[in-house]
């Protein structure tokens, strides 16, 4: 007669634990997006400022205030999510606010997309939301890869829809795949690749596990492949492109990058967080608390192989292999069911997820707060630039990109905001053909150098004193003659060329000089 009481007590404990997890998740979500919601906190992410500068150019296009050095040339290229969304909204609420809200929307898509996928696979929500919060400021996202983050969030939703519709009619699956292929191509090409790869692996598992006939397998894959083939044919007919042609493999760093994926600002924090997650996964696995669902092993094996094979730079897009790791980290929780041995282990898991999230977000807040003086000084420096100045950027360090201390990385692209505030020309504004719809006007194209890193100032000094050696990029061969001002980014150093540079303004992480003619 005591069993019903025990069962009722267990049910109450389960509901209490579930309600507690929901409350903790809600609080963690608010904490995780707090840096973006804080209006006076500068978003100190390396690519964010460069993207923001391009949004200003797009918002001004077609008006009397169109930029004197840059033009907008629309074509059939991917990676246009923010380019299509932010400028139009920015004309009504301000470009800076619109860009911040776009980044917030991308974060929401990442978290909700991971949760939607888990619900589609397991029929319930369990761990995916917590894992998504842990990775919300992982390396690709903390670097300000905005279109990729938005696209990956959409890809997670697309994968969830594919699982939801896997037993529906061919026409329903074809329509859904077509819609997501079009959406993801527009958002970010690599996010489209992640979506296609994940859905393809899931379909392979389904065909294998159900011993489907060749005819049925062909029919199912045709619903996935036909939209991609139509897109490819349309791109060929329209002379579209997907970026540059530079591919670079860095196999020696792949093991360490897994340890450094969790935080885009602090490698030690990332290492501790990754090792803590590995410990938790190992401890739960030893207690038979983890169960793989559906295509979990296929996804794990496929994405692991993809990570090993993927170059660091693909079509002139960097950190590509690290993006594979983040995608896998967001997908896998949906395919792993956890049966905690007891309430203590549930509390340990939630506490560990909360601790990693809070520590990671706190690190983000500390770095962003430390940049308030630099961003304020940058705005002041833009006021000191004459309208239409030709401005160059170089490093005080050794030319490393990224630098050894990732906390110094966000300053790299801050000077590009002079494109808007001073109508300036800068070689490093993102204007890569096949990736962005903004290009320099014809007279200035010889000076562009987008997405190719920042040269050390000692190299500029060598060119000024001895001439340009073979292989020197065109924009720097006659830099003293071609440019009016120079931003030196990185740790403060004495004036490296007093005879050629006149100090204008300094900040903790950069200095502005006028180039003497």
Language-model segments: which ranges?
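Transmembrane catalytic cores of multi-pass membrane glycosyltransferases
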Residues: 42-50, 62-64, 70, 78-79, ...
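Short hydrophobic/aromatic helix or loop-helix immediately within or flanking a transmembrane segment
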Residues: 53-60, 71-95
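Transmembrane-helix motifs of polytopic, lipid-linked glycan transferases
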Residues: 101-121
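Transmembrane-helix signature of polytopic, membrane-embedded enzymes
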Residues: 114-136
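Short acidic/glycine- and proline-prone juxtamembrane loop motifs at membrane-interface regions
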Residues: 143-150
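Hydrophobic/aromatic-rich transmembrane helices and adjacent perimembrane loops
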Residues: 315-342
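Signature aromatic-anchored transmembrane alpha helix within multi-pass, membrane-resident enzymes
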Residues: 334, 338-364
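Short periplasmic/luminal acceptor-recognition loop of GT-C membrane glycosyltransferases, typified by
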Residues: 371, 382-469, 475, 479-491
